[in-house]
Amino acid sequence: MAESVPIPEPPGYPLIGNLGEFTSNPLSDLNRLADTYGPIFRLRLGAKAPIFVSSNSLINEVCDEKRFKKTLKSVLSQVREGVHDGLFTAFEDEPNWGKAHRILVPAFGPLSIRGMFPEMHDIATQLCMKFARHGPRTPIDTSDNFTRLALDTLALCAMDFRFYSYYKEELHPFIEAMGDFLTESGNRNRRPPFAPNFLYRAANEKFYGDIALMKSVADEVVAARKASPSDRKDLLAAMLNGVDPQTGEKLSDENITNQLITFLIAGHETTSGTLSFAMYQLLKNPEAYSKVQKEVDEVVGRGPVLVEHLTKLPYISAVLRETLRLNSPITAFGLEAIDDTFLGGKYLVKKGEIVTALLSRGHVDPVVYGNDADKFIPERMLDDEFARLNKEYPNCWKPFGNGKRACIGRPFAWQESLLAMVVLFQNFNFTMTDPNYALEIKQTLTIKPDHFYINATLRHGMTPTELEHVLAGNGATSSSTHNIKAAANLDAKAGSGKPMAIFYGSNSGTCEALANRLASDAPSHGFSATTVGPLDQAKQNLPEDRPVVIVTASYEGQPPSNAAHFIKWMEDLDGNDMEKVSYAVFACGHHDWVETFHRIPKLVDSTLEKRGGTRLVPMGSADAATSDMFSDFEAWEDIVLWPGLKEKYKISDEESGGQKGLLVEVSTPRKTSLRQDVEEALVVAEKTLTKSGPAKKHIEIQLPSAMTYKAGDYLAILPLNPKSTVARVFRRFSLAWDSFLKIQSEGPTTLPTNVAISAFDVFSAYVELSQPATKRNILALAEATEDKDTIQELERLAGDAYQAEISPKRVSVLDLLEKFPAVALPISSYLAMLPPMRVRQYSISSSPFADPSKLTLTYSLLDAPSLSGQGRHVGVATNFLSHLTAGDKLHVSVRASSEAFHLPSDAEKTPIICVAAGTGLAPLRGFIQERAAMLAAGRTLAPALLFFGCRNPEIDDLYAEEFERWEKMGAVDVRRAYSRATDKSEGCKYVQDRVYHDRADVFKVWDQGAKVFICGSREIGKAVEDVCVRLAIEKAQQNGRDVTEEMARAWFERSRNERFATDVFD
């Protein structure tokens, strides 16, 4: 007998064992445990001690039906309370399992499934018509709508029963009962065995009430069929009339009820989840999205979808397979050992012990899928490659379960999913309602995206009525109306001027704010912004009957998240596709990204012209490194854009109305107002990390229950303006502290309108008070006074003095109002000048491996004398954070960092080199904390070097004790550079000096395949890049090769995001 090795397991507590490992996100918890403890681990859950396997090699072993069989000892024992001996929850030796299996398998044969196509198409068209009639501005809850699709399709095709889900606002009560039943099944499975039953009296009553409701619906379906018999050959007919060829028996009425509930649950939950995840993945991956739409257009065209088309869609099939690999709605399945056996040749599993195959990790095994296993790449699932993977790595793709207990309805679900994908992408363009949406998971026994909303815009300029004819097979609408009608599809409420469309590409909100500013300015120049929206909304829908203005930025050379689909579509254009489009482009960027500065706006500008578009005015641009974005934009508006548009479209001075600003009423009733674009979190703890000098602080935050993150991600904070700054506004405009404002606006605004809202709320939460004044702002101040000296000085500041005295010193409108008391600016005009409050992103400085429900931030407090000479310059977000204490609440959202800025998936093989200074240490602390958790769980890791720069070990050596502890564990080797104590850091003053000093060690781990992470200010990023280039030259010389600096820098750029990942900030 082989020698047994203990199965790794986390430390537990008496009685409850490892129950404390679980939060409200059990899937995330299990993934974390697998990442921490490796491919096999055990949990102690009261009297249970299940084993979990997460690598392909071990999952392949437990899929051997000679050694393991399906278990009902897990959560399925609770599900069985509701469906008893239905196919999914029956024991294999129960007579009804074999009987039902033999009777029902023929009902899912190829010809039967093919015959269900017309009814599947019926329900799919109902979904399309709902999307079309709600219009492009209505957010669509994907999980809700695909749940309706899957439930109605299954009920109609399998049982000839209609739930009419698309004709009701609320979902059928069966859905809520089913969801609650499955959730409570999971909860019951995790109950401590010693907990008395009376604690769960209400939950138990609800549980059995839900079961009763589901049974009543199933009985209703059966009764309807019995009342109106038919010769349909569907699933229900097979249940009612089928005879088991082996026993000669029929299914009992009770078993039919159990089977119906089983199919209604399993048949729609998984399909709706798959389609929702597929939509998410495609919207996150524009290239794959484009290929799906191209395949639909080439195979199906504009006509009706036929069943014959579904076998000619290899790429969409690959998309569904890849979706099921990364986001399988069934995340795991349980088995039990038939006899004593060894896994991996060394881990003893005793007869009857439960082993759970964790697909959420097995499906991303880098041994099978490579180091990009976490990425959505449908090409790896095309037929030939899919077959190769499954041959070389058996059981590497198991979303439909295992062996004879695998999903019986797989052919049904596959045809339904293919059809839904085709009709949707044939007729609509989709965008995320929130382009920064980070995937949230809703988990019962299956998973699906939570709070995932999309917008659907009809393609080809169709109206809903025309779509209805197309879906009915009555012919496609003419494409000649494409862009003119598209403009109508996108129209907002139009004003009285010449219509124009404005689109933006924006991650941080700056370009969106500029676009809204442009829309507000339009009426005063004779135009009306009928459309203001993200660039993705303009995909295949660029208007031809009005000027189009595009405001966009680049992010490391890539398009903003809400412009990626537009850019991919635009790059695929041919010939003179844009010959009827008249456009103008404004570019935002930062010149420190030399290689990619303004890349995306330049690409838009040149490509539209190349494809026949008419450039209305020269492209405008702003460089955040040297000037103020808002000032540059307003200058382009006033000097270039509006004069050019007015000349092109013959707008007279009479048609140019006055500025449509804000109308503000002041009142004093007390009322609260909330902001809802982020979620509420709770401060757990905070502390100051430095002993003197510039303060660096640490804050620990309890996340909302559905929010998850990875080490290296960002936390977006919606701050409040400092009370001292808000007080200055109140003094300047003589507002009482309990004043309320009622704001009315004829143009787009992010301010709350038509309701009375606290003035304090408005100025603290909705607007930026410290944004530098623009030239237009300053000239508006000059118009609001009759004092000649004030006018003269303000006009000087708006002229040549602006670049020296306003922009670099960040002089705000409020600063100028205080400096020039003779300016009588109305509060409405002041509010109209202010940009909307934006979120600030901070690198998370912890790992979920430490505690998935909490995270930490590490930041520098900005509070210094103002460069303008008026008071102090107080950082909005850092001041906000610094005043929070335990128990305070704040609004946050997790934002994923670039894919490159995460730990390697093969931590055992790939070393890391981390370089940071000051609070740039934040994400790297998260990395090392994660490595420490892995080591504590018994994992073996590749080396890690951390180079860290600060001032003095006695003052600002951040987290020194933690890193000392982690060094002793072997999680990291720390090399420091003290700028004011070089005698304690090998004579090295700055972090780049220490990297060069220790170059022999750097070369050693680099040759082992190390990945380099750099985090800090732009100056640090540039200095470390320089030393890396220097090291590359020296390394080449050691190997006998001559490499110039230019060649070395080119190599560094090629390696960026592959072996070098940077995260720099201002």
From Swiss-Prot:
<dbReference type="InterPro" id="IPR017927">
    <property type="entry name" value="FAD-bd_FR_type"/>
</dbReference>
<dbReference type="InterPro" id="IPR001433">
    <property type="entry name" value="OxRdtase_FAD/NAD-bd"/>
</dbReference>
<dbReference type="GO" id="GO:0020037">
    <property type="term" value="F:heme binding"/>
</dbReference>
<dbReference type="InterPro" id="IPR008254">
    <property type="entry name" value="Flavodoxin/NO_synth"/>
</dbReference>
<dbReference type="GO" id="GO:0003958">
    <property type="term" value="F:NADPH-hemoprotein reductase activity"/>
</dbReference>
<dbReference type="InterPro" id="IPR001128">
    <property type="entry name" value="Cyt_P450"/>
</dbReference>
<dbReference type="InterPro" id="IPR002401">
    <property type="entry name" value="Cyt_P450_E_grp-I"/>
</dbReference>
<feature type="binding site">
    <location>
        <position position="596"/>
    </location>
    <ligand>
        <name>FMN</name>
    </ligand>
</feature>
<keyword id="KW-0521">NADP</keyword>
<comment type="function">
    <text>Functions as a fatty acid monooxygenase. Catalyzes hydroxylation of fatty acids at omega-1, omega-2 and omega-3 positions. Shows activity toward fatty acids with a chain length of 9-18 carbons with optimum chain lengths of 12-14 carbons (lauric, tridecylic and myristic acids). Can also use shorter saturated fatty acids with a chain length of 9 or 10 carbons as substrates. Also displays a NADPH-dependent reductase activity in the C-terminal domain, which allows electron transfer from NADPH to the heme iron of the cytochrome P450 N-terminal domain.</text>
</comment>
<dbReference type="GO" id="GO:0005829">
    <property type="term" value="C:cytosol"/>
</dbReference>
<keyword id="KW-0349">Heme</keyword>
<dbReference type="Pfam" id="PF00667">
    <property type="entry name" value="FAD_binding_1"/>
</dbReference>
<dbReference type="InterPro" id="IPR003097">
    <property type="entry name" value="CysJ-like_FAD-binding"/>
</dbReference>
<feature type="binding site">
    <location>
        <begin position="554"/>
        <end position="557"/>
    </location>
    <ligand>
        <name>FMN</name>
    </ligand>
</feature>
<feature type="region of interest" description="Cytochrome P450">
    <location>
        <begin position="1"/>
        <end position="480"/>
    </location>
</feature>
<feature type="region of interest" description="NADPH-P-450 reductase">
    <location>
        <begin position="481"/>
        <end position="1066"/>
    </location>
</feature>
<keyword id="KW-0813">Transport</keyword>
<keyword id="KW-0560">Oxidoreductase</keyword>
<keyword id="KW-0472">Membrane</keyword>
<feature type="site" description="Important for catalytic activity">
    <location>
        <position position="270"/>
    </location>
</feature>
<dbReference type="GO" id="GO:0050660">
    <property type="term" value="F:flavin adenine dinucleotide binding"/>
</dbReference>
<keyword id="KW-0288">FMN</keyword>
<dbReference type="GO" id="GO:0005506">
    <property type="term" value="F:iron ion binding"/>
</dbReference>
<dbReference type="Pfam" id="PF00175">
    <property type="entry name" value="NAD_binding_1"/>
</dbReference>
<dbReference type="InterPro" id="IPR029039">
    <property type="entry name" value="Flavoprotein-like_sf"/>
</dbReference>
<comment type="similarity">
    <text>In the N-terminal section; belongs to the cytochrome P450 family.</text>
</comment>
<dbReference type="GO" id="GO:0010181">
    <property type="term" value="F:FMN binding"/>
</dbReference>
<feature type="binding site">
    <location>
        <position position="588"/>
    </location>
    <ligand>
        <name>FMN</name>
    </ligand>
</feature>
<keyword id="KW-0285">Flavoprotein</keyword>
<keyword id="KW-0503">Monooxygenase</keyword>
<dbReference type="InterPro" id="IPR023173">
    <property type="entry name" value="NADPH_Cyt_P450_Rdtase_alpha"/>
</dbReference>
<feature type="domain" description="FAD-binding FR-type">
    <location>
        <begin position="676"/>
        <end position="904"/>
    </location>
</feature>
<keyword id="KW-0249">Electron transport</keyword>
<feature type="binding site" description="axial binding residue">
    <location>
        <position position="407"/>
    </location>
    <ligand>
        <name>heme</name>
    </ligand>
</feature>
<dbReference type="InterPro" id="IPR023206">
    <property type="entry name" value="Bifunctional_P450_P450_red"/>
</dbReference>
<dbReference type="GO" id="GO:0070330">
    <property type="term" value="F:aromatase activity"/>
</dbReference>
<dbReference type="Pfam" id="PF00258">
    <property type="entry name" value="Flavodoxin_1"/>
</dbReference>
<dbReference type="InterPro" id="IPR039261">
    <property type="entry name" value="FNR_nucleotide-bd"/>
</dbReference>
<dbReference type="GO" id="GO:0016020">
    <property type="term" value="C:membrane"/>
</dbReference>
<keyword id="KW-0511">Multifunctional enzyme</keyword>
<keyword id="KW-0479">Metal-binding</keyword>
